[in-house]
Every structure is written in structure tokens, then in C-alpha cells.
Amino acid sequence: IYLHTFKGKLIKQITSGNWEVKKIVAVDEKNEKVYFMANKKSVFENRFYSIGFNGKDLTLLTKEPGSHSVKLFPDYSGFLDTYSNLNTPSRHLLKDIEGNLIKVISETDKSQFEEYDWSYPEIIKFQTDDNSTALDGIITYPPNFKKGKRYPVIVHGYGMPGTQIVYNRWGSTWNQFLAHQGYIVFSLDARGMSGRGEDFKNLSYGDMSKYLSRDTAAGVKHLISIGIADPEKIGAWGWSGGGYFTGLMLTKNADLFDVGVSVAPVMDFRLYDSIYTERSMGLPKDNKAGYDSTSVLSYVDRFKGKLLVIHGTGDD
């Protein structure tokens, strides 16, 4: 966070460190404080903080592990905190401005999930194919998962620049449904995604397919190498950017992926809206090679699996 004059002159850098400010929630000009969300405690978590304009008195206001969202009172006297983590379904807490609990507004009875053999997701680490970077993935196992047995895998992907999938938050009910059908459900944050700073995020600039395809392949191969994934039964699915991800896996990574469901995909970003695409890819006239490499159409000759494409008549 930086403090500037209205004419753009830098007054002071307020925050620093190897973590990301995710969102500025409010600026209290009278008391010279900034309230913001950040992943300082963990790359997998959004927590609520305050700090003075002078860069001092950085204070964590949400002490519960997990992913938080807050609604700050207009008079800065307190806030409503909504959070969950991998082991705790959504809770809604009323707190004072120091982060002290005033009242539990509502919370979910976890025992209701356990009646359905809820499978608690696990965050894992694996290495990139060049061993340069440790990446994060998240797995939902089938109920009664047994080590030594290989399972079919569904990779749920998105992978667009600056986004993040792997979080410490309550799991998806759709992933639970798939796990209950006997699948391992796997997602990962490839190089070029969010949570690890600008250098990591900018790795995908100019070619959105390069690390997305390589790092997803590395993640799947890791599951195969530790003996839990059936290499003959690997599928992918996703929506929008995830639809693109699925198309890419079934073509560029056709030797790994057998089947996919692609919903509302962008198969060639030259055909998508420029306001989104050009901030990650530059202009088509200046980056033909990057647009060609990013396009799913460049790899259709490799396609050999089964792909279901679902689309409407319009998108953004």
C-alpha cells in the first residue's frame, strides 16, 4: 500500500514484505488508518488487518485461520466477519474494531456434513518439471480412501492470470459429489496465478498456456508417482477460463488427459474481449507467437480423447 497526494506524488510506502495486499477495505482519514485484506499469515488465507498511515502498528484483526471477508461499520467501531477453513464451515461473527468477538451471528453445524461422509480436502506441495518451484495443490479424496489404490482423477482448473484456486476454506459441495462417485478431485495454482507476488504472477504474461499446461502436467504426474492416480483415467473440467483450461489439457496435454467437460470456453483469446485479454497478452499485432501458443486451436492435431463442450449464445 502506498500513500500519494491527489496529484500522484508518493508520500510513503505503508506496507512491505513477502506477502500480498488483496483488497483495501476502508481508509479512516481522521485516525489515519488503512483497513485491508492480505495473505500475510498464509498464501492460502485472506485475513483482515489495519495499519497506520505512517506504516506502523500493523494489526491482525481476524485471528481465526482461514479465508475471511468483512463488512466494516461506517463509524469504524466494529465489523462483521465471515470466514471458513478446510475444517470449519462458514461462520458469521460480530467483532469490535480490535477484533474481539462480540457475538456469533450464525454458524454451521459441521455434524450435518459428517453424516454424509464429508471428505476434508488436503493442501499438498509438488515440484515443477524443472524443479525450480514448489507449487500448491488441493485434493478432495473419495470417502474411505485407501493408500496403495489408484483412483480416477478429475482436475478442476481455471488458471487465468492473477487468480487463485488453492485456499484454506470450506470445500466445494460439487467436489464432494464427485469424490463420492469414486474420483480424486485435484486443483492447483500454476505459475502465473495469484498469491505469491508480482514476479510469480507475471510469469504468464504474453503466453497464458506455457506454465498452465506444464504445471498441471507436473501436478498430475506427482499424483501418479505417489501411487494414488490411475494414469489411464485422468479428466479435466472447468467453466469460462476453466473451459479454456480443459480444452488446453485435452490438446496440449493430450498424452495425460483422456476426457474433459469444457463450459463456456475461450479457445482463442484473439476472439475474446480486448479489455481482459490485452492486459495479460499485449496486442495481437505485437505478440503473434504468444497468441498462437495460447490458442487451443494450435494443438487440435494432438486431440485424441473425449471432450464435451457446453456453451450458451453469449458471454461477457
Segments from the language model and where they lie:
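Residue position within the beta-strands of beta-propeller blades
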Residues: K33-M37, F79-T82
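Serine-hydrolase catalytic core recognition
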Residues: S67-D316
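Structural motif
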Residues: I1-Y2, V43-Y49, N87-L94
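Multi-bladed beta-propeller domains
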Residues: H4-K30, A38-K41, I51-H68, I97-Q127
